């Protein structure tokens, strides 16, 4: 069953990859903030993050952890013109906003938040072997879509 967050339809994991459910961003992922582009590792509560849905949101909290999880690699330019601008690695459960032919073809929707693992095609969006990643999760008062690594990434609340 799908749910709606800030007017964007979000999907639920149907693949049940277990440890793949981990979401977040790798610590070196570049985030768009009101102070410019910063790596996720340098962002702290109180920072103002640029969002697709609200323009700007104040970050309430940050979770940092190192763990072993499945990861997805998205090759540069594979999700649109310069989207992402360079190869990006994300934990497999990270929600990504798609709003192109993929959303229409796969979900009959103009835009949709989906776990990045659901976009695997074996060539441009590929599953990497489980690996140790430094993960950063952002916590907001309401769900938001942020700009991270040249992609639009869904961030949740502290539920």
Regions found by a protein language model. Give the residues of each.
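A sequence-level detector of short linear motifs
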Residues: 39-40, 58
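Long beta-strand-rich cores associated with HINT superfamily self-processing modules
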Residues: 26-33, 50-56, 60-159
């Amino acid at each position: 069953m799908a749910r709606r967050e800030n007017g964007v339809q979000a999907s639920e994991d149907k693949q049940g990859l277990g440890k793949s459910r981990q979401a977040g961003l790798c610590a070196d992922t570049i985030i768009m903030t009101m102070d410019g582009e910063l790596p996720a590792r340098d962002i702290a509560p109180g920072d103002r993050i640029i969002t697709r849905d609200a323009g700007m949101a104040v970050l309430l909290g940050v979770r940092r952890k190192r763990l072993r999880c499945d990861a997805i690699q998205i090759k540069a330019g594979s999700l649109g013109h310069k989207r992402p601008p360079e190869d990006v690695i994300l934990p497999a459960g990270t929600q990504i906003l798609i709003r192109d032919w993929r959303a229409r073809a796969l979900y009959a929707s103009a835009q949709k938040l989906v776990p990045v693992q659901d976009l695997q095609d074996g060539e441009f969006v590929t599953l990497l072997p489980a690996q140790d990643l430094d993960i950063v999760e952002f916590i907001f008062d309401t769900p938001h879509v942020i700009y991270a690594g040249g992609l639009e990434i869904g961030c949740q609340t502290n539920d």
